[in-house]
């Protein structure tokens, strides 16, 4: 295709798309609304990623560097698509930074937003300082400061991880499974136990859905090697 391809979103999917296109000689225009590339893993301060175990800043940082240095990728950060019109093979795009470009196709890789746990007040998030989200724990780990109780900075002796908060829940109109939270939680539990071997970690679950090869690597390993306790319950 002689015209560049528009990519909306500079997270992992958008970065992978830009790199894949460049490998076959196809130019692209990547538009990201944040002031930097990387998406949720970078902007939210993720720790180690599943299933590779790489630190987010290293894995995603490598993807960002590869795209930024590629002459076939034109990057626009702190920008949005203001206008998009035309027909397949001939679209006109106006970017909020003033750039106008003609593209042949568009790839939407706009990412996601984390569930706001304030919408499940029964678990005390937003009321009790030591009730935190997975993302907040990820930030504690990735900062290098370790997992601590926000209320007073002490090392926790017991941690309960509640699964399916914000998913598989008809009361809030979210009946679907996220497909990744069980695995992420098992990984997080192992990270907590690795840092705090005297801390007891409990995972409360409806069903464990560690899809594919994740069952052995995360579900069973977290129990057998790290002694994480799983408790079946309807939270």
Where are the model-predicted features located?
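Rossmann-like dinucleotide/flavin-binding elements
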Residues: 1-43, 84, 99-100, 111-212
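Feature captures the FAD/FMN-dependent oxidoreductase FAD-binding
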Residues: 4-6, 13, 59-115, 210-211, ...
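Short, flexible loop segments at the rims of nucleotide/cofactor-binding pockets, characterized by
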Residues: 51-53, 90, 208
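N-terminal glycine-rich dinucleotide-binding loop that anchors FAD/FMN and/or NAD(P) in oxidoreductases
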Residues: 42-81, 121-137, 186-191, 214-235
């Amino acid at each position: 295709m002689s015209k560049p391809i528009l990519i909306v979103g500079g997270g992992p999917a958008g970065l992978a798309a830009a790199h894949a296109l460049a490998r076959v000689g196809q130019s692209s225009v990547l538009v990201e609304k944040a002031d930097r590339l990387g998406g949720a893993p970078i902007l939210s301060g993720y720790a180690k990623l599943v299933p590779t175990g790489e630190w987010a800043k290293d894995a995603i940082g490598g993807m960002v560097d590869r795209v930024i240095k590629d002459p076939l990728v034109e990057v626009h950060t702190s920008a949005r698509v203001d206008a998009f019109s035309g027909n397949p093979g001939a679209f006109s795009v106006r970017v909020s930074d003033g750039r106008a470009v003609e593209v042949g196709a568009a790839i939407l890789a706009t990412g996601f937003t984390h569930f706001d746990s304030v919408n499940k007040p029964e678990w005390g998030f937003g009321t009790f300082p030591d009730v935190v989200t997975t993302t907040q724990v990820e930030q504690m780990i990735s900062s290098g400061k370790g997992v601590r109780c926000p209320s007073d900075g002490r090392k926790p002796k017991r941690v309960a991880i509640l699964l399916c908060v914000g998913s598989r829940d008809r009361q809030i109109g979210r009946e679907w499974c996220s497909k990744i939270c069980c695995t992420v939680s098992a990984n997080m539990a192992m990270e907590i136990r690795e840092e705090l071997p005297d801390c007891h970690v409990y995972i409360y679950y409806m069903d464990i859905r560690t899809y594919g090869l994740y069952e052995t690597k995360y579900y069973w390993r977290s129990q057998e090697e790290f002694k994480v306790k799983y408790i079946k319950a309807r939270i």
